[in-house]
């Protein structure tokens, strides 16, 4: 009779979130995300799924904290490999996860076709197959059970989950899981998923994840502090104006979910206040267009300011005169030939795939242009190389000189920094908290976060190791 947890991903790294809760013989998986980074390495890790010793069919239920790819990207693969249990998530997470997973299936199919044709030209053998396809996504979607915030629900014998708002992206949650084994031992665990930030546009602030015995905590920015939201607006205003004065293009790699909508919101505000010139703003991402539509139908997730814009003032924060959405490949290609000044927001946020790569191929060589980094860039990604100051980068099969200006605004991050995390922890009963497990961070960030939490008075802080089973009851 026992209760234990084990991290199968996002332990001593940021991507691939998967945490296994075992209560006697019952297995609950919290998140099933994809690894990102260098393609071959990430692909091998994703195909390993839960490792050699755990079959997908042995998982009784999946709790999904939110719809980012590194938390939901392998859900269809899990179902394909034999998982038949329920997937518990908020309704907004369900809608966004459907979009993310379907897009991933399409990208994999396209990559397989392209790589197959390239191998054929070289008379080479090609046997790479996508992890999953559209059918697998549809099958996984049939397993979703939507759960509202603050509505505890039994997900297995002796196991209950309650969702609280994590303030990270639309529909994101903390999962407070109460587990009781057959011997009568009870443990209340708090899974932070990704901890959000106060004062972010559109969505509500993170709630208090109190009344817990064990905490599994996001540590992405354990060694960094963010700019304030107001500083970020001024910085964005400055970058737009300087690029416009050079008659250049401002190219912004952005995740299609949340980051793009937040950028639209902020550019709308700057435009309405006359702080930036009336130049074309293009969102070149089919998924971002669809995600923005999903944002529009989930007002239950809005903060008061955004809710009032929609309901009291009947104003759409995701639409204004300068904003355009590209709806075809031809629209996207035309942007590469268009003259500046203009702004292009495009996915993928880490520049690993998608239309952003074509905009970078056409724009990096021009010193009038700016590439603005507004989110986390995992090690090994093109975005990380640009952020770290590379003078030449490889995109697809060609090399490109980096003459464009590279700027960064980290205040758009949806992850709390270390100080915000410590402040958020003030609401938790520290004397009740028996143990904290740090996940979702690179080694330097995890070690720094451990030190900050010790300084804040937390005891028994563990940096979780991949595959290590921690018995908690």
Residue locations for each model-derived region?
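Short active-site oxyanion
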Residues: 60-61, 83-86, 249, 278-280, ...
């Amino acid at each position: 009779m026992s209760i234990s947890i084990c991290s199968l991903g996002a332990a001593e790294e940021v991507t691939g979130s998967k945490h296994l809760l075992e209560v006697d013989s019952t297995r609950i998986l919290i998140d099933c995300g994809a690894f990102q980074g260098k393609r071959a390495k990430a692909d091998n890790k994703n195909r390993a799924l839960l490792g050699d010793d755990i079959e997908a069919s042995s998982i009784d239920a999946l709790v999904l904290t939110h719809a980012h790819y590194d938390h939901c990207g392998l859900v269809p693969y899990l179902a394909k490999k034999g998982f038949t249990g329920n997937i518990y998530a908020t309704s907004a997470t369900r809608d966004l996860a459907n979009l993310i997973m379907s897009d991933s299936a399409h990208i994999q199919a396209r990559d397989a076709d392209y790589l197959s044709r390239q191998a054929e030209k070289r008379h080479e053998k090609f046997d790479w197959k996508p992890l999953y396809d559209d059918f697998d996504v549809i099958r996984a979607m049939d397993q979703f059970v939507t759960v509202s915030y603050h509505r505890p629900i039994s997900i297995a014998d002796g196991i209950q989950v309650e969702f609280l708002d994590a303030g990270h992206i639309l529909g994101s949650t903390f999962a407070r899981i109460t587990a009781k084994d057959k011997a009568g031992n009870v443990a209340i665990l708090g899974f932070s998923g990704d901890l959000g930030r106060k004062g972010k546009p559109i969505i509500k602030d993170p709630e208090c994840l109190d009344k817990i015995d064990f905490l599994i905590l996001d540590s992405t920015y354990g060694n960094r502090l963010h700019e304030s939201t107001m500083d970020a607006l001024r910085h964005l205003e400055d970058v737009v104006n300087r690029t416009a004065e050079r008659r250049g293009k401002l190219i912004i790699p952005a995740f299609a979910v949340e980051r793009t909508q937040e950028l639209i919101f902020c550019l709308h505000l700057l435009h309405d206040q006359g702080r930036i010139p009336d130049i074309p703003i293009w969102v070149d991402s089919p998924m971002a267009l669809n995600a923005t539509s999903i944002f529009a139908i989930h007002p239950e997730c809005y903060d008061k300011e955004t809710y009032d814009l929609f309901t009291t003032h009947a104003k759409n924060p995701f639409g204004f005169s300068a904003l355009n959405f590209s709806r075809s490949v031809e629209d996207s290609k035309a942007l590469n030939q268009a003259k500046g000044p203009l702004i292009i927001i495009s996915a993928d946020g880490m520049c690993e795939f998608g239309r952003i790569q074509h905009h970078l191929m056409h724009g990096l060589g021009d010193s009038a242009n700016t590439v603005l980094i507004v989110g986390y860039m995992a090690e090994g990604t093109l975005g990380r190389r640009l952020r770290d100051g590379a003078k030449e980068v490889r995109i697809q099969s060609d090399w490109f000189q980096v003459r464009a200006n590279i700027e960064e605004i980290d205040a758009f991050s949806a992850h709390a920094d270390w100080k915000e995390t410590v402040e958020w922890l003030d609401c938790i009963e520290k004397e009740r908290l028996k143990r904290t497990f740090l996940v979702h961070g690179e080694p330097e960030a995890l070690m720094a976060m451990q030190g900050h939490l010790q300084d804040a008075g937390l005891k028994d802080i563990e940096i979780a190791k991949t595959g290590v089973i921690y018995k908690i009851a």
